[in-house]
């Protein structure tokens, strides 16, 4: 699998390209068993449900905050990528791992991929976290 950020397409070398193309109507068969799939969030969720490795699209297509105190750590980027590509996911990490920021970044990315007002998100956090 490789990801082309310029065209936002994921390319898989599939042993059964017809099955992958049948599961994803937007998939296009390329040469020698390769299949190109547009890296939209619904397609990525389907690929993940099929057990395929999916790219970390937020690393390429999201403008992470540049303020030094809000710069995401590696584990926060991993969690935000996971939550953005796995609908209805939960982040039950330990206290102090900055779950709320990861969830906010994931929600911001997901909402930017859909028409305004068509995507909703619920983030549950203690009041003390929101006051900081």
Where are these regions (language model features)?
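Residue-level recognition of short, structured coil/turn motifs
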Residues: 25, 115-116
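Conserved pre-motif I regulatory segment
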Residues: 53-94, 101
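Conserved Walker A/P-loop ATP-binding site and its immediately adjacent core
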Residues: 100-105, 117-132
């Amino acid at each position: 699998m490789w990801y082309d950020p310029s065209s936002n397409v994921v390319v898989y070398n599939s042993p059964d390209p017809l099955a992958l193309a049948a599961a994803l109507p937007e998939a296009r068969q390329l040469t020698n068993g390769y299949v190109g799939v547009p890296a939209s969030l619904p397609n990525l969720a389907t690929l993940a449900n099929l057990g395929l490795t999916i790219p970390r699209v937020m690393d390429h297509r999201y403008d992470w905050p540049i303020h030094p105190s809000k710069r995401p750590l590696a584990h926060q980027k991993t969690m935000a990528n996971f939550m953005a590509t796995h609908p209805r996911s939960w982040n039950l990490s330990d206290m102090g791992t900055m779950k709320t920021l990861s969830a906010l970044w994931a929600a911001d990315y997901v909402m930017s991929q859909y028409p305004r007002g068509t995507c909703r998100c619920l983030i549950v956090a203690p009041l003390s976290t929101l006051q900081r």
